[in-house]
Amino acid sequence: MGTSLQLISPATGLVIHLVNSTGTPVAGGSPFLPSTTPFGTRSEWTPAAAAADLLERGGGPFANGSDLAWLSYPTIDETIPLLWFGTAGEAGRAVQMLRDQFAALYAQPCLLYCRPSGATTGVYFEILSARVQEAEFDGTKRSPAEGAAAVFIDLEIRRRPFAGLAALETLISAATIGNTGTGSPDNDIAYEASVTVKGDLRFEGSPLNVRLTKPTGQSPVAVHMASIYSRAYQSIASAKTTSTTTTFTASTAIDVSALRTRAGLKLRVVGRLTTLTSPSNAQVRATVQTASGATLAVLPWVQLGSDTSAQFVDFGATTLDALRVPLSNTTSVIILGEIKSLSGSVTATLSYIEVLLYYDYCIVECSAALSTSQRLHVLGAQNLAGGGWLPMLAPAALITDGSDAPVRTAVVKGTAPRAYAGASFWIGWVDANGAHTASDTAALTVTHAPQYRSLGSVS
């Protein structure tokens, strides 16, 4: 299959072909058909690969430079070198036609569609703005201003750094997922159980769209979701009553060796409390310790809700930098939970904990409980211009009815999950006042928008 290079404008509704499918521009031909277009490229142009903007940390005297804290990618400025073969006086028409494609202030951006020769798949870049400059064609005696029939055109564009495909790829399709870390189904599903995560960001995180139907039992007001490297579940079953502060039974050793070699991972502790009395007067926290009991991190106190049956608790996260050292032994931690009373006697049983080594974690606040047939959507990818699926500038969340008509918005707090090779999707949901039903299930669909820096990995 031959090379295809197109400008697709939501503003004009026109598709202009910048490369002739026969390999030779047709003088005076229609630019709206691949076989008759008078446009061509002057050189072996290919989209420039995005260079990352780095957010660094550390450094200073005697340090080996700085550590990488975050990656982002800026817009790209580049020039597409075009030529136009027309008939007498047509150069002005070609220039105006190109300029009209970018009248996008009150429309979605013009799309640059690229399909390399021999590839079956094309990708779409969003062009934010463009400058069209005509120039004299080599070997001619007439400039564009003098009505030259053939001209060079420099198409100077500012575009987004990534290109997307015309369709999302489904990683998880209407799968039943649980609300606890054990049993079948449990609360995590591998992204690559049936489909490989693709694209140039598969190890950096590429956008996901998540759809969760209302669970079979609960009516969630908040949903926790994450992209995780691993999850460790441990039953604790420790009951405590106190008017001051006391500790639950500690977990056994949990392997966190991956923190040494995967700098972006963080550790998070979540858990479930049952059989509560006066929970509104209680707070809990978790301490991360070495396998021998030395304190590594003390997470903040968490206020409990009012539900007395069972509550889901997000104890918080830590980077555990103290363990990122070059030792060969397995690196393990134990988790010690505590409960304290703010007033009077309080009782709770720490049923279990889960320790997540995670890439991304967020809490989606639904503003009101999900009702029958409603769905929660967390959207990291968009195709508003009608072409490829590209990242949202910021992930959006909303509640819809069963036909996906919007009902109300929701709020994403934290970093919405992204797709990583080898990672899994993890979830937990709660009703009002922190109420948690471990046996609850829901249908989950997760779709993925592969992103491409250039055409080198497009097939």
Where are these regions (language model features)?
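Extracellular/virion structural assembly segments
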Residues: M1-Y229, N281, V325-S328, Y358-S459
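Polar, enzyme-active/binding microenvironments
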Residues: S21-S35, G40-T41, Q218, M225-C362, ...
